[in-house]
Amino acid sequence: MNKQLLSCSLKSGKQVTMVVASVATDGVDQQVEISYYDQKVIGNGSFGVVFLAKLSTTNEMVAIKKVLQDKRFKNRELQIMRKLNHPNIVKLKYFFYSSGDKKDELYLNLILEYVPETVYRVARHYSKQRQSIPMIYVKLYMYQLLRSLAYIHSIGICHRDIKPQNLLIDPETGILKLCDFGSAKYLVRNEPNVSYICSRYYRAPELIFGATNYTNSIDVWSAGTVIAELLLGQPIFPGDSGVDQLVEIIKVLGTPTREQIQSMNPNYKEFKFPQIKAHPWNKVFRVHTPAEAIDLISKIIEYTPTSRPTPQAACQHAFFDELRSPDARLPSGRALPQLEMDGPNEVSATGGDMAGPSA
């Protein structure tokens, strides 16, 4: 098992760390010696710490995610990330293990490509300026999010924590990359999963109802709430607690029917809810919100999990037609990043007609 090798200072004052790391490509058992410097903390949480650093050989910026490793188990995030290869998913380059301060403490270090911004920070910037995020960005970022979901779902992986903070973007190119697979899991039919997953504002209602046999459609719901947030300038369902989260959803969708509750969790037996009518979608959003955007959200933010479109089908919605125009450009005048459905796992689209609002 790899251990951190050496940390030293050069005459320039740079603190350089040298490690023996494993190449991240799945099925490749190769170790390389790498060194990095200019390490600084750029994020932390219950999972561990994220550092920004530069690789000495190339001066390439990387993010190093350091998490405490339980020696009894394989790290699920590492196993999943080694399988992933998609332009809209952050790339794992190398990984290595290091010792902690305490006896027998072991850390897993994931060396990832660095992407400078997040959808969360960009949306907050526009909100502080009392401006709406340009619609071309909403379309561009959300299309790429759906592409990334189409890919991971096609290989059986559910992300389970879609939120603006986990959507990395390069403002210059407009490319979006999904990150943080710490909650991700291969979902197997009839195998139970924990329902307390996903950040509250973006949590699908079946999770709030305690479902353990949920599907990839929880990611689709989360994606819908992110699109809605970009259009509104604030979260669409800002619940203060698990129960309050359901209240916020009911305010918009109305009280779920008995059949809808059964579709979310067949084992849920309590049906005592105040009867509230659905709020018209066009009154949820600002006056000038495109009808296609509202139509897409109304199809995604749906109680019955099987009624939500697949990510592939959502990508075909009329809301994204502008991206398919050869004349489409970023506000800077730069061409859009490559967006066609370009992989065998992204071609098929099931989930009904997603053409857009009827005339």
From Swiss-Prot:
GO terms for biological process: cell differentiation; engulfment of apoptotic cell; establishment of mitotic spindle orientation; germ cell development; left/right axis specification; negative regulation of canonical Wnt signaling pathway; positive regulation of distal tip cell migration; positive regulation of engulfment of apoptotic cell. GO terms for molecular function: ATP binding; protein serine/threonine kinase activity. The keyword Transferase applies. Coiled coil: none annotated. Disulfide bonds: none annotated. Keywords: ATP-binding, Developmental protein, Kinase, Nucleotide-binding, Serine/threonine-protein kinase, Stress response, Transferase, Wnt signaling pathway. Residues 330-359 are annotated as: Disordered. The active site is at D161. One of its GO terms (cellular component) is axon. Residues 36-320 form the Protein kinase domain. Its EC number is 2.7.11.26. InterPro entries: GSK-3 (IPR050591), Kinase-like_dom_sf (IPR011009), Prot_kinase_dom (IPR000719), Protein_kinase_ATP_BS (IPR017441), Ser/Thr_kinase_AS (IPR008271), STKc_GSK3 (IPR039192). PROSITE patterns: PROTEIN_KINASE_ATP, PROTEIN_KINASE_DOM, PROTEIN_KINASE_ST. The keyword Cytoplasm does not apply. It comes from the Eukaryota. ATP binds at I42, G43, N44, G45, S46, F47, G48, V49, V50, K65. It catalyses: L-seryl-[tau protein] + ATP = O-phospho-L-seryl-[tau protein] + ADP + H(+); L-threonyl-[tau protein] + ATP = O-phospho-L-threonyl-[tau protein] + ADP + H(+). It holds the Pfam family Pkinase. Monomer. Interacts with axl-1. Phosphorylates oma-1, a regulator of the oocyte-to-embryo transition, enabling its degradation. Phosphorylates skn-1, preventing it from accumulating in nuclei and thus inhibiting phase II gene expression in the oxidative stress defense. Involved in mesendoderm specification and mitotic spindle orientation in EMS blastomeres. Thought to be a branch point in these processes as proteins downstream are not required. Negatively regulates Wnt signaling in vulval precursor cells and acts as a Wnt-independent repressor of med-1 and med-2 in the C lineage inhibiting mesoderm development. PANTHER family: GLYCOGEN SYNTHASE KINASE-3 ALPHA, PROTEIN KINASE SHAGGY-RELATED. Belongs to the protein kinase superfamily. CMGC Ser/Thr protein kinase family. GSK-3 subfamily. This is Glycogen synthase kinase-3. The lineage of its organism: Eukaryota, Metazoa, Ecdysozoa, Nematoda, Chromadorea.
